[in-house]
């Protein structure tokens, strides 16, 4: 029998891994990657997620159980049950370019893993510091940055899980998840939107824009 040295075996594994990492295949189960961005004044909010379809399945309370669930893998056990990943595949994430408020509760600028605990009358939204996990298999409460409670709302049928922004104002908007016949809205507010504009105007007044007198007048009128 021909023998292979450990170095040769390791080299073969590395070559195989590199070759596999370069493959781009269609998403399984129609879990299409999606992203939606909304500006609230100067503040950028982005939700990145995978979008599964209903495909004739019963979603709420069955495919997506109510409450916390032991997934039987990773850190998800009976002792440490998991919330829902709020999408499919890897973590759903939400990013804020500046500090904002979610349902009146403050959260700093940054990117967060978004998880949800579904309920028949109330849902809990979890913003986690872990943004690179696969779904909720590695979820631990110690990584929670913020939790807020919201009410689900019945809506028209949506085949694909979708996030969108509605009720948009200059410094606030409602983000919501929609799937099957249910939506989960949560309000995002910029508490200091005018202050951000004033700070931005001060910075612009040190640039070449200051040489146009119309810009100085516009800045003075706003302030």
Question: Where are the regions that the model predicts?
Answer:
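Targeting-peptide/extracellular-domain and disordered-appendage signature
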Residues: 20-107, 113-223
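Bacterial Sec-dependent N-terminal signal peptides
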Residues: 1-24
């Amino acid at each position: 029998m021909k023998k292979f040295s450990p170095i040769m075996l390791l080299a073969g594994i590395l070559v195989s891994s590199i070759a596999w990492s370069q493959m781009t295949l269609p998403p399984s189960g129609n879990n299409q990657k999606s992203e939606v961005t909304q500006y609230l004044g100067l503040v950028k909010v982005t939700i990145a997620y995978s979008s599964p379809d209903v495909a004739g399945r019963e979603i709420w309370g069955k495919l997506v159980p109510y409450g916390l669930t032991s997934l039987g893998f990773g850190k998800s056990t009976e002792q440490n049950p998991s919330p829902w990943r709020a999408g499919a595949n890897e973590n759903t994430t939400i990013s804020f370019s500046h500090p904002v408020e979610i349902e009146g509760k403050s959260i700093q600028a940054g990117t967060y893993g978004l998880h949800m605990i579904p309920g028949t009358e109330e849902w809990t939204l979890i913003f986690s510091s872990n943004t690179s996990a696969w779904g909720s298999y590695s979820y631990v409460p110690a990584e929670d940055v913020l939790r807020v409670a919201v009410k689900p709302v019945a809506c028209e049928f949506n085949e694909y899980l979708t996030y969108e922004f509605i009720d948009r104002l200059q410094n606030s908007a409602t983000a919501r998840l929609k799937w099957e016949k249910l939506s989960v809205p949560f309000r995002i507010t910029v508490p200091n939107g005018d202050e951000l504009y004033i700070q931005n105007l001060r910075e612009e007044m040190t640039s070449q824009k200051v040489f146009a007198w119309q810009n100085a007048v516009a800045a003075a009128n706003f302030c």
